Every structure is written in C-alpha cells, then in structure tokens.
Amino acid sequence: MTTDVRILGIDPGLRRTGWGLITARGTKLSYLACGVVTSDGDLPLALRLRELHEGLTRVLTTHAPDEVSVEETFVNKDAQATLKLGHARAVALLVPALAGLPVAEYAANLVKKTVAGNGHAEKVQIQAMVKFLLPKAEFKLADAADALAIAITHASHRGAIALDRRHAVAAGSGPGAARIAAALARLDR
C-alpha cells in the first residue's frame, strides 16, 4: 500500500526563497501550500540569513514535510551574486537537515525537463505546467511556482534514486537521527 509523502520544494534566494508543499501518493500529486520567505535587503548579510532560517523553520514546523528537495546553485558571471545565492542555499539545506529530514538536490535544467519536458523551458512554461499538474495551486510569485516544480521533480525522481545520504545525521547521533532513519527506510521499500 502506498502512503502519502509530504514533499517540500525550496527555491533558494537571498531576497526571496520560494517554498512549495505537495503530497505524492505513487504518481498522484496534490497541492497543499506554497509561499515565499523574504529577507530585508537593507539588513547586513548575517541578519538576512537569520531571517531566511527563521522563515524556513516556521514553514517546516507548520507544514511538517517528510522529505525536502532544494534546487542546486548555478554559477553566473556575477561572482558576488553567486556567493550570496550560495549562502541562501546553505540555509535552505541546513534548516531541514537540523530538523532531521532527508534532503535531495536537483539541477535547474532537470527540474525544467521533468516539469515542462524541456531543460531550457522559460518561467512562463514552468508556471503553466505547475498549474496543469497541480490544478489547485495558487501562487503569486515565480519563486513559489519554482519551488512547487522542485517538489514535483522530487516526487518524480524519488523512487528512481536514493537520497544523498551525505545530508543525513550519522546513524544513532543527533536529535533527528531517528526521523532520518525512518524516512530513509520508507524510501528503501
């Protein structure tokens, strides 16, 4: 018997980090919630990262996902912007890891290919396909739609690949070790 798995997708960004929550039961997907966590651009970097940490922690506490998927960082020509994105991505990886949740990572072109059938799809195409796959989804910002696309990608690929166990707390240690072991056991069935 297949059980519902609550999957949180995260689209990291320093200004806006999108999040999207779905349930997957086999190949059936259902929309639960989505939104963005923002940081104040006038604050120093450390305080902006704290805002993202607190916001994502609230999302995890409120929505209790079973698994988390995060978009990988792409390198662009602006090194400073890439570094800032890397900081936000680190928070997006750290928060679920501290909660004892398994985390998977997906490249942007794989997300686009999975959701729209084209690894170079435009944002408008991604949003249209997210709406098609999750008809009840309501998102006002592209960041939330992207996060839902990341969650959809994880739902599509989670049975075919094992989660990257490097993000798991060492067996038997840490407050989330039991929850990670249970989540990984569900994946191995």
Curated annotation (Swiss-Prot):
It catalyses: Endonucleolytic cleavage at a junction such as a reciprocal single-stranded crossover between two homologous DNA duplexes (Holliday junction). It comes from the Bacteria. It is found in: Cytoplasm. GO terms for biological process: DNA recombination; DNA repair. The keyword S-adenosyl-L-methionine does not apply. The RuvA-RuvB-RuvC complex processes Holliday junction (HJ) DNA during genetic recombination and DNA repair. Endonuclease that resolves HJ intermediates. Cleaves cruciform DNA by making single-stranded nicks across the HJ at symmetrical positions within the homologous arms, yielding a 5'-phosphate and a 3'-hydroxyl group; requires a central core of homology in the junction. The consensus cleavage sequence is 5'-(A/T)TT(C/G)-3'. Cleavage occurs on the 3'-side of the TT dinucleotide at the point of strand exchange. Homodimer which binds Holliday junction (HJ) DNA. The HJ becomes 2-fold symmetrical on binding to RuvC with unstacked arms; it has a different conformation from HJ DNA in complex with RuvA. In the full resolvosome a probable DNA-RuvA(4)-RuvB(12)-RuvC(2) complex forms which resolves the HJ. This is Crossover junction endodeoxyribonuclease RuvC. It comes from Methylorubrum populi (strain ATCC BAA-705 / NCIMB 13946 / BJ001).
